[in-house]
Amino acid sequence: DEGPTVVIGDLHLGYEHALEQDGLYLPRINTGSIRDALNDIMSRYEPERVVLLGDVKHDFRRAGREESNQVRGIIDLISEDAQVVVVRGNHDNYIMAVSHIDIMGYRLEHGHEDSGVRPVIIGHEHPSVRIPGAVGGGMKIQCFVHAEKEGVIVIPPFSPFSSGNDLVMDDDCVMAPALKASDYADARIYGVTDMGLMDLGTLRSLFDVKVRRYNIGLYIQYTDSVHWLL
């Protein structure tokens, strides 16, 4: 039975605690933000299954009490209404997980390794695009990446702390083997905004993008089109 399924990845639970071990202190907002977003998703879409697509936890080491409690709490929250499938990411040492799952004709795997099966949905990459402003500055948008010809879909991280690898400004930053093996410059980019998903064109087209701010709003200007953001 393949009922409605939600796929999220790269939660990196325990992120703040891991940084504290190195003397860096951040507001403890990661788990709370993830819980709020999950509650919204569960009530809006009523999925029968939720796939956690790897890097559920942050620390590579065995989970401590705090990280374990956060992971257990998120899984328990989802389990109240849906089946939970945990796919193993490269951070997910010492937790129960599967290497992949096949759903509706798609291979779902974290993405730090490539099984070679297509079409595939992966995380791991933390994709984003940074669009420079005309007078400096700019903005960074988390995004989905769809390399349709190669059958590769990359989802953005679910953690609010994961700002993402900038595919526009540093095309050498690509980590996921499946994405590296594709012609990702021609992949379609879908930005995640407060208004929903926004088609930003291909990655190749974004190399020439400019952002201009006017008192009537902010828009992304391409060579051949304008997409309103605000």
What are these regions (language model features)?
Residues 1-53, 57-230:
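Extended recognition/assembly regions associated with phosphoester-bond processing machinery
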